[in-house]
């Protein structure tokens, strides 16, 4: 049998402060499915994207890569985040056919939001 991977089911991020992280991800448009401000584990969803947050109070953030989320109208999404007081980098075009921007969550996890350029 050859297993066929369909997609990533969820990405789990270590966080130092669950309440702070939940607020950040809510501003990104994620809704809480499980857990909460006092929980050690929370699950969130935005569209078909799932993110888990695992409380690790002594987590020392270190760059490991980034999670990339597909969005429509990346410039409008960027503007909406900036208007909420978040600090996304300016959107830019990539040679591989995407327009994207990066933003770091409160624990330093790099997130990228991208749309395909036609």
List the model feature ranges, each with a label:
Residues 31-65, 110-115:
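Conserved short beta-strand elements that form part of the metal-binding/catalytic scaffold
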Residues 16-18, 67-110:
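Vicinal oxygen chelate
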Residues 26-33, 85-86:
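Conserved acetyl-CoA-binding loop of GNAT-fold acetyltransferases
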Residues 4-7, 59-64, 94-95:
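Short glycine-enriched loop/turn motifs at secondary-structure junctions
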Residues 9, 39-40, 65, 97-99:
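Residue-level marker for the onset of beta-strands and adjacent loop->beta junctions
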Residues 1-20, 67, 116-118:
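N-terminal beta-strand motif that seeds the catalytic metal site of vicinal oxygen chelate
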């Amino acid at each position: 049998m050859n297993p066929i991977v369909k997609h990533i089911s969820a990405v789990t991020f270590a966080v130092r402060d669950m309440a702070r992280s939940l607020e950040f991800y809510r501003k990104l448009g994620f809704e809480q499915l499980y857990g909460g401000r006092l929980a050690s584990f929370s699950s969130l969803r935005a569209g078909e994207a799932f993110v888990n947050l695992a409380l690790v109070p002594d987590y020392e953030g270190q760059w490991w890569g980034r999670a990339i989320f597909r969005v429509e109208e990346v410039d409008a999404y960027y503007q909406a985040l900036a208007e909420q007081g978040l600090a996304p980098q300016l959107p830019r075009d990539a040679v591989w056919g995407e327009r994207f921007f990066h933003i770091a969550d409160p624990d330093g996890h790099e997130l990228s939001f991208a749309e395909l350029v036609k």
